[in-house]
Amino acid sequence: MIASTESPRTNFSLSRGLLDVGIAVLAFVLVCAALNALLPFPEIDVVSAELRFFKEHRDEFDTVFIGSSRIHHQISPAIFDRVMGEAGHPTRTFNFGINGMFPPESGYVLERLLSTKPRLKWVFIELDELETRRIPKAEASRRSLYWHDWKRTSLVLRKILDGDDQRDARDLFFFHTALFAKNFANIGRKIDLSWWISHLGKKTAAPKSLGRDGDGYVPQIKTMSEAEAVAYEAGLKRAVVQAELRRVSPSTERAYRQWADDVRKAGATPIFLITPTRAQTKFEFRPESGVAGAVMPFNDAKGYPQLYRNEIRVDADHLNETGAEEFTRLIADTLSRLINDGRIQ
């Protein structure tokens, strides 16, 4: 029999080395987790300021719209409240739309908003697929980083892995994983602590992003040029022909189910809103999905032709001020009708 040449001391050293590495990794993870819990919310352009404003004024609102620029520039709280009041269902509305805020970032912000314990009645959430694409202009920004906690990142990674394009999937998988790692490791958080200390006890001014009435709505005045209108009409005709009813992806469904549950736990009713974009695909949830929320789809050029007139649009996806006012009235009328019919409460 040939005796082993590997000494017990070597085996012990290797095991001890692995143990030391494991302890170091565990310590790093625990420290990062502790810092995540203790550090103030990151100072993110527009987002942080509006969250602070909402927290300070949360008792003044019972209705919130949350989503992207298609909410920010297209929902007038003043008009919504007026129409709802005239219908016998008074509301006090805040527009929490932020340019470029798509799910799952919007879901993360919704959770932060609900954590302020507002007394809400209605929460409108823009309905769209989870955004997984890389946005070159924003890749290096803290805006891309701050919402990448494990809850959001796992949803994005699952959506990527469920996709068809494996080449893009590999790149996107590592991209979002890297953002999660940076966020978890608190990269760049020193600036947040410094900001928090320097503003401790100071009252901050209302952010300009809240618009002229301080309710979050910023209308757009622009109209399409003749050339833009021609291109828009041609694209809309194609979109109407290709219109379809499509179920959201499993990851998107999971995300919206959680958000709907969170809203209901907060004592409010969730409503999912599809804005009048040129894309005519109607999203829906599986009947057995368990998503507890009504869907209001307004991306229907045949059903709502008044929202697709050239003169009330900025581009294929956005309405100007005139269009936004008309859209807001339609939403309020629809909600009032659902309440009166007992189909929502």
Model segments located where?
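N-terminal Lys/Arg-rich, disordered targeting/topogenic segments
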Residues: 1-16
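Alpha-helical transmembrane signal-anchor/signal-peptide segments
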Residues: 38-59
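Short hydrophobic beta-strand that contains or immediately precedes a catalytic carboxylate
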Residues: 64-67, 319
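Membrane-embedded segments
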Residues: 66, 70-160
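Active-site segments of SGNH/GDSL-like serine hydrolases
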Residues: 190, 257-283
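C-terminal regions of proteins
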Residues: 282-345
